[in-house]
Each structure stands twice: as structure tokens, then as C-alpha cells.
A protein has these predicted regions:
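A structural boundary signal for the start of the first folded domain, especially the loop/turn
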Residues: 1-92, 105-201
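Conserved acidic residues
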Residues: 95
Length: 201
């Protein structure tokens, strides 16, 4: 009897974790508390585009302890929950995973550059399901770009240049133009002064 209990306990425990069941067939687990349809649409399209680009990321949004099923003790512990969830969804192969909670993020399976980018992410701006989804939209874009798989063409998703800071490459050009303009202006001033003091005839 004891042996039978030990054998069925792991599967029963897994079934008690809603995200692990959902993520086996979908890219995103949403909290039980409603998430704005627009945010869901954007995040779904973004993760689909990321998968197509070679970055098949699974995302779990955890807004309340009830979203964790039989393991509410892992609420507000995004990395610990990511470690647990990874074991539940990676039995067929390693999965790229992002967990989003109000106090931060947890990750598993990411390449080093994306893991580093995840450590620099700012926590979500709020605690609602929609705010978690909005934070995930920005996070997925940054992680995909850091991993070398930028997401393009998805409305509502930050561009890769915005996500990685590569947009700052225009700064040196602007500085160069300003310096050139200043030098030209200074040259004109000097030329006019020389013409003004030149003896007549």
C-alpha cells in the first residue's frame, strides 16, 4: 500500500500544479484572475513569434497563491517555482522557461546571455494579471533579443533595438553631426574676422 502511494504521489502532485498542465500544450499560463484580452493577444502572438524565431519560451504568470494549486508556499518565490516547474514540463526535453510574479522573475533553461538579461529585468509595475502580462511582453522581447532571436513584426511588442539598447547606436552619429556643425560655424566666424581686419586696397 505504501509503495502504491509513493508511485502515484508524483503524478498527483503534478496534476495539482495548473501551470505545468497548461504549458505542456500552450506557451503561456495565465492567472485565474482575468487578464486583459489585448495583453493576452499580444503575449500569445509574441511567444508564437519567438518560437518561430528559434526561441520557444514558456511563460507562467503567477498572480496569486491559488495559481500554484497544491504548492501555494512557492508564491512570491519566482526562482524556486521556476525550478519546480522546470522539472514538471521538461521530461521530454529541456524547456526555456520564464516565471513572472509581482516581485520578480524566475528562469530555467535559458542561454547565458538571456539569463544575464533576465537578472537585469525590472519587476512588474503592479500586481494585477494584466500588469504581469505587460511585464512578460517586455521581458520576452529582451530575453529573445539577448539570445540572438529578436522578435519582429508583432504589434505591441518592443522592437529588438529598444529591448537591447542597440538604438543608442545613433547617438555617436548625432554627436558627430553636432561637432561638425560647431566646427563649420567656428570656421565661418574666424574667416569673417580675418576679412574684417584685412587692409583695404
Amino acid at each position: 500500500m505504501l509503495l502504491a502511494c509513493l508511485l502515484i504521489a508524483p503524478s498527483a502532485f503534478a496534476d495539482g500544479d495548473p501551470a505545468s498542465d497548461t504549458l505542456l500544450g500552450q506557451n503561456v499560463f495565465y492567472p485565474y484572475s482575468p487578464t486583459a484580452t489585448s495583453a493576452q493577444r499580444t503575449l500569445n502572438a509574441e511567444t508564437a513569434a519567438a518560437k518561430k524565431a528559434g526561441f520557444p519560451l514558456k511563460v507562467a504568470l503567477i498572480q496569486a497563491p491559488t495559481d500554484l494549486g497544491v504548492i501555494p508556499s512557492l508564491f512570491a518565490k519566482p526562482q524556486q517555482y521556476a525550478d519546480f516547474l522546470d522539472q514538471e514540463i521538461s521530461f521530454k526535453g529541456k524547456q526555456l522557461l520564464l516565471v513572472v510574479m509581482a516581485n520578480g522573475y524566475g528562469t530555467e533553461g535559458l542561454p547565458p546571455a538571456a539569463t544575464k538579461a533576465a537578472a537585469a529585468l525590472r519587476p512588474p509595475s503592479g500586481k494585477t494579471s494584466t500588469e504581469l502580462a505587460q511585464a512578460a511582453i517586455g521581458a520576452v522581447a529582451k530575453l529573445a533579443s539577448a539570445a540572438g532571436h529578436p522578435i519582429k513584426g508583432v504589434p505591441g511588442v518592443p522592437s529588438s533595438s529598444t529591448s537591447t539598447g542597440s538604438g543608442s547606436s545613433t547617438t555617436p552619429i548625432l554627436i558627430g553631426l553636432i561637432v561638425a556643425a560647431v566646427l563649420v560655424a567656428a570656421g565661418l566666424v574666424v574667416l569673417r574676422r580675418r576679412q574684417a581686419v584685412r587692409p583695404a586696397g
